[in-house]
């Protein structure tokens, strides 16, 4: 809030899709100018949808068929819904999301799906390499570790979201500051000079950032903003 009072624009830049960001009460309580969602594929600024990119229909069946062929647990992520593969048992992570969002869940097999990206979990039978190859015409693979994978359309990333907004507001990248903590933040941490890693972030990212702040629970974001004189 102090950052915005001082005339700066504040955005959430998330891999999550729109509903999974704006329906989090703690995010709304803080207050942001906008949201870069779905790894750059959906950008909302003060209620205006500046960019909405969804997976082309010709890729829908290819993703679902490949997930079943190579035994990957699949979750399609859209601006309004999660799409669950109900043909296989759910692991704890998928079940938790299914239970948390009863008004935002659909079956992957319904027609006319609308999604921006997807994630997968490996199973004991998974052939991850073959799955990644099968969907590679459309998607970039981010290995999140622990058998969890994130797949974003080639033309979009957290970095492209930053560039879109910089162009929109006539800013240079030197005017942009980014704070991240995990591997799906790597594109934006590499893209912007003033890149900041949370103290509790993935250790391998330390070599990719300009500054490492304190842990999230030790006022890491506030301390980073103070370090760069963005707030007093």
Which stretches of residues belong to each language-model region?
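Asp-based, Mg2+/Mn2+-dependent phosphohydrolase catalytic module
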Residues: 191, 195, 199-232
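Short active-site oxyanion
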Residues: 7-11, 31-33, 116-118, 174-175, ...
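Hydrophobic residues within well-ordered alpha-helices
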Residues: 3, 39, 162, 188-192
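Phosphate- and divalent-cation-binding pockets in alpha/beta enzyme and binding domains
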Residues: 20-23, 130, 161, 187-188, ...
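Short, structured coil segments at secondary-structure junctions
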Residues: 28-31, 39, 134-138, 191-192, ...
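Active-site phosphate-binding/coordination module
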Residues: 1-90
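Hydrophobic/aromatic beta-strand patches that form the interior of the parallel beta-sheet core
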Residues: 11, 36, 177-179, 196, ...
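Conserved acidic, metal-coordinating active-site core of Asp-based
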Residues: 66-188, 200
